[in-house]
Amino acid sequence: MWEKMETKTIVYDLDTSGGLMEQIQALLAPPKTDEAEKRSRKPEKESRRSGRATNHDSCDSCKEGGDLLCCDHCPAAFHLQCCNPPLSEEMLPPGEWMCHRCTVRRKKREQKKELGHVNGLVDKSSKRTTSPSSDTDLLDRPASKTELKAIAHARILERRASRPGTPTSNASTETPTSEHNDVDEDIVDVDEEPVAAEPDYVQPQLRRPFELLIAAAMERNPTQFQLPNELTCTTALPGSSKRRRKEETTGKNVKRTQHELDHNGLVPLPVKVCFTCNRSCRVAPLIQCDYCPLLFHMDCLEPPLTAMPLGRWMCPNHIEHVVLNQKNLTLSNRCQVFDRFQDTISQHVVKVDFLNRIHKKHPPNRRVLQSVKRRSLKVPDAIKSQYQFPPPLIAPAAIRDGELICSGVPEESQTHLLNSEHLATQAEQQEWLCSVVALQCSILKHLSAKQMPSPWDSEQTEKADIKPVIVTDSSITTSLQTADKAPLPSHYPLSCPSAVSTQNSLGCSPPHQPPTLEDISCSSCVEKSKKAPCGTANGPVNTEIKANGPHLYSSPTDSTDPRRLPGANTPLPGLTHRQGWPRPLTPPSAGGLQNHVGIIVKTENATGPSSCPQRSLVPVPSLPPSIPSSCASIENTSTLHRKTVQSQIGPSSTESRPLGSPPNATRVLTPPQAAGDSILATGANQRFCSPAPSSDGKVSPGTLSIGSALTVPSFPANSTAMVDLTNSLRAFMDVNGEIEINMLDEKLIKFLALQRVHQLFPSRVQASPGNVGTHPLASGGHHPEVQRKEVQARAVFCPLLGLGGAVNMCYRTLYIGTGADMDVCLTNYGHCNYVSGKHACIFYDENTKHYELLNYSEHGTTVDNVLYSCDFSEKTPPTPPSSIVAKVQSVIRRRRHQKQDEEPSEEAAMMSSQAQGPQRRPCNCKASSSSLIGGSGAGWEGTALLHHGSYIKLGCLQFVFSITEFATKQPKGDASLLQDGVLAEKLSLKPHQGPVLRSNSVP
């Protein structure tokens, strides 16, 4: 029964191993971040063999990655080309590969085994291979002398056998990069440790001191050379490369904490702002300084940056910028300066250092920046002597020898200027005018007081050569004044001194006495200065002007009606105006010289009408006493005759020229000369041809051209032969004004016939060598083709002493000297002992567009008061020759002296520029110009720059260089505007005003 009442045990299916608290805590726990799990995770590497598990990922030699060949016995890895010896893919072994170090050690172990068998130490050698400490045990136990010698000898053999057959690479050991190799060597090369413990036994067996080092180096793997750490620059200088994180190099945007920068320079919260503008990175990316916590925008920097810096960047708040920017600092100095300023600087130290500096008694010199030195040039001794001993000054450029030098009409660019801007003041003009009038009056008084020369001899005229001659403005004035000394009546109103000479030339001889020259006023000429200004009487010049190119003297004609003088049935023949002369065109040269082309008269007339009309050499009938000799009456008669001449020649170019325009001619300035000089020869008026007589044998005196009247035999202008010739022509005139040829004198007929022969045969007269200075009479009218082929003159070389003629420079060069082949032969201009055969040369430089003079003479040439001569200074000797050269020169010099002593003495023939023969004639030179050089004797051998009006002196011969383009500059403008009187007056220079000289461009 009790068995029935026994209860059964209840079994519950519950897990009693643990409670539910862990699960409850896991459900109630906060969420976990994944960063810890990611960081804790490590990539599982593949299981590799133990031998290759420690191989390096980069080459042990060059420390670069790539395809590497791994050693099977050590962790070393190499490129195929970095192995020792280098390998190729075909040379790779099929089985295991050992590096050079492992190969050497394997051979070493094998040799040790063989050596142990030889010496009967097989057991010990076997133990040595099994136990790494066998060598130490061997040394600890006592050994005999024979055993020690055997061991030492074995070590030497091992080192010799360990040398491979091929040499190692050029690289040596490298301390910081061979850490793995050193560890492996310590593990594997334990058997080498006893070598250091027994140096006494090894050293006596070594033959060379570095044999042990070489043996150790031969066992190492090849490595590239690198400086040790103590020699390498470890200072982080600005601009050096810095290590980047792997995320930056791979470009992965890794999530970082909020206080760090991302790789784009954007700064999340907490906000960091720019040090300059205090704005965040939302404006622009910020740049973090690598040496301080400051940040900057790229645009806030000075100067602003265009890109983010790649290396280390230092902000401008550091003092190192001032010190490190110096160019003379080396790398070691930069590192020292950078390390010095790395720590914080004490303000107290700065103050004390400043006080010590300012209280120093002898402060150090400041570093002064060396300024860039200009290129220095050594001043020649010739220029120094020129400033030390200046020559005497020449006359002013505006007035020379009492004659005004004008520069022509201003250019178009200067026409807008008023007359007062480029002319003298009114007071200066009045003073200049009074001086010119007083000068002319004194010249007339001097010339009128001279004695009249002897009359013309008719017999000498027949034998002498008949050459066409004409008188210029300056020479006619003085020559006609001395022709007739008859006084003028006191009641004649004379307008200017030129009227005296004009009336005297006309043959007037009233009984009354003339007034004094001081009482003569020039008021009428001043009033009519625009039409007929008074010119200066410079006197005749005995020269033959040699023309070089076509120069046509053309000017406007007056529009006044022809007037006849009261009491005379015919107009005054031969009275012409200067502006009516046509400019002659010269034929080719006739002397064999390139610059001696022809003959031309060049006058100084820069403004329209010329001076009072005393222009004719042909005498006219005497005037009645009641006729007033004024400039206007004579001007009208000259205009009448000029119109008559132009009607014979044909259409003239002078009709088309507006009134007031100056003639396009070359002006040559000649100084005043004595009254006894001969007449200036020219061919200016020889272009006019006298017509053939009519069928009835009568010729009208009005049809006689200027050329026929002026082309007379070369006799003095002041003789009475011309007056007699004119009177004989008037005696045979009939009532109608025609001349009966049958009634003419025989001499007059011969003269007219000879003139006609010159007109008909110009080529024969021109080709004759004696007529170089002459000019054909009709070449201008009969040979227009020749005129077009002629060359116009570039410049004129004019003498100042009255001898010789002016030479035109029509080509680029002009040679001056006493030689026969010179363009300007100085013997024609006077005698001087200090001139050379080839004295100087004038040439035109295309680069500088200027004329230049080059001196060849040892006497020198003075240009514009500056001496240009040869350099006679002692030249510095070159470097002394070597001993061998000096000995050879001494032998040659000694041999030359011996030959001179053996030869008979003869007079040494010397070449000299001075003429050999009779004694030289004296000249006006006191000494050669080269004597004016300073004591050093260094003359200036450069070229002289020539301008318009440059003064040239060759010895005692004086010349003036004139540029034709400068003297003939024409105003550019419309012809209709030039006809306006007001504008023409502004553009033209008045003759009584002193113009200001201006430089002009060279042609």
Swiss-Prot record:
Ranges where the record places region Disordered: 29-59, 110-183, 234-255, 531-583, 641-671, 894-922
GO CC aspect terms: nucleus; Sin3-type complex; transcription repressor complex
Lineage, top ranks: Eukaryota, Metazoa, Chordata, Craniata, Vertebrata
Gene3D superfamilies recorded: PHD finger protein 12 (6.10.20.60), Zinc/RING finger domain, C3HC4 (zinc finger) (3.30.40.10)
Knockout-associated phenotype: Mutant embryos die at mid- to late gestation with diverse developmental defects, including edema and internal hemorrhage. They show a global growth retardation whith 14.5 dpc embryos in a comparable size to 11.5 dpc wild-type embryos. They also present impaired development of the skeleton, the assocaited skeletal muscle and the brain.
Modification Phosphoserine, positions: S131, S134, S555
Tissue: Expressed mainly in heart, brain, lung, liver and testis.
Residue spans of biased composition, Polar residues class: 165-178, 641-656
SMART domains assigned: PHD
Keyword match Transport: no
Native organism: Mus musculus (Mouse)
Biased composition (Low complexity): 907-916
Residue positions binding Zn(2+) 3: C274, C277, H297, C300
Described function: Transcriptional repressor acting as key scaffolding subunit of SIN3 complexes which contributes to complex assembly by contacting each core subunit domain, stabilizes the complex and constitutes the substrate receptor by recruiting the H3 histone tail. SIN3 complexes are composed of a SIN3 scaffold subunit, one catalytic core (HDAC1 or HDAC2) and 2 chromatin targeting modules. SIN3B complex represses transcription and counteracts the histone acetyltransferase activity of EP300 through the recognition H3K27ac marks by PHF12 and the activity of the histone deacetylase HDAC2.
Subunit architecture: Component of SIN3 complexes. Interacts with SIN3A in a complex composed of HDAC1, SAP30 and SIN3A. Component of the SIN3B complex, which includes SIN3B, HDAC2 or HDAC1, PHF12 and MORF4L1; interacts directly with all subunits. Interacts with TLE5.
Binding sites annotated in the UniProt record for Zn(2+) 1: C59, S61, C62, H79, C82
InterPro entries reported in the protein's UniProt record: FHA_dom, PHF12, PHF12_MRG-bd, PHF12_MRG-bd_sf, SMAD_FHA_dom_sf, Zinc_finger_PHD-type_CS, Znf_FYVE_PHD, Znf_PHD
Note on domains (UniProt): In the context of the SIN3B complex, the PHD-type 1 Zinc finger delivers the H3 substrate to the HDAC active site. The atypical PHD-type 2 Zinc finger has a structural role raher than a substrate recruitment role, wedged betweem SIN3B amd the HDAC and stabilizing the SIN3B:HDAC2 interaction. Also interacts with SIN3B through the SIN3 interacting domain 2 (SID2). Interacts with MORF4L1 through PHD-type 1 in a SIN3 interacting domain 1 (SID1)-dependent manner. The polybasic region (PBR) is responsive to the binding to phosphoinositides (PtdInsPs).
Location(s) in or outside the cell: Nucleus
Record keywords, A-Z: Isopeptide bond, Metal-binding, Nucleus, Phosphoprotein, Repeat, Repressor, Transcription, Transcription regulation, Ubl conjugation, Zinc, Zinc-finger
Keyword Phosphoprotein included in the entry's annotation: yes
Biological process (GO), any one: negative regulation of transcription by RNA polymerase II
Cross-link position per record: Glycyl lysine isopeptide (Lys-Gly) (interchain with G-Cter in SUMO2): K467, K899, K972, K986, K990
ZnF PHD-type span: 56-105, 271-321
Modified residue annotations for Phosphothreonine: T557, T570, T670
Protein name per UniProt: PHD finger protein 12
Region (SIN3 interacting domain 1): 202-241
